[in-house]
């Protein structure tokens, strides 16, 4: 397949990226690691990584907005998009333009070919997003996990805060058939000695065990609000 150039448009690049790997989903970090390392991207000052069955999009958007209002230059990575691919990659709330994306795609593709590895569409897109964020010197990165957590390409970067919104039965072909199995995959974003936030009260045992084994700095439950918020809220 012909490799697009910097002069090709975004549609051409997206078609190419959708056809260079044998499967749309291919869990694991082994193929991605050499490309990521060769990119040699500077680590941002602060990284939020958000996993969970539901609510990842609204959670990442809220975190990004708060950080931006606080005066930081904020990178936001989400998926999937609704209308335009560019929605997935934002800096200070503004979608990255086609030219910036194409340059990122071209840079990642040169390194991918040099490393001799194949990347899925999501893996390639994620590395391109990281390249955009690093080139724009974003201080805070807010990253949404695509699928699961432990083996998701987003998890290649160590977070400073890990957020798991909730855990429900979903994507059982990839994450496991039970809530505990799925939770164990999502718990893969947890690192030792960082804040971990879990967004529902019935925490799966596998997440609790991961917190204990890694001695995560602390964790808390999010506040729950109903129509009777004043009576229903529960503190950390």
Locate each region found by the language model.
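Short glycine/serine/threonine-rich phosphate/pyrophosphate-binding segments
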Residues: 58-62, 149-151
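Conserved catalytic-core segment of NTP-binding enzymes
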Residues: 149-151, 158-210, 214
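Short functional linear segments
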Residues: 1-52, 59, 65-70, 77, ...
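ATP-dependent carboxylate-amine ligase catalytic core
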Residues: 25, 29, 33-43, 69-157, ...
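Aromatic/hydrophobic pocket-lining residues that form π-stacking "cages" and hydrophobic walls in ligand
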Residues: 63, 129, 207, 211, ...
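Conserved small/polar residues in nucleotide/adenosyl-binding loops
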Residues: 225-232
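Conserved adenylation A10 loop of the ANL superfamily
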Residues: 50-57, 165, 226
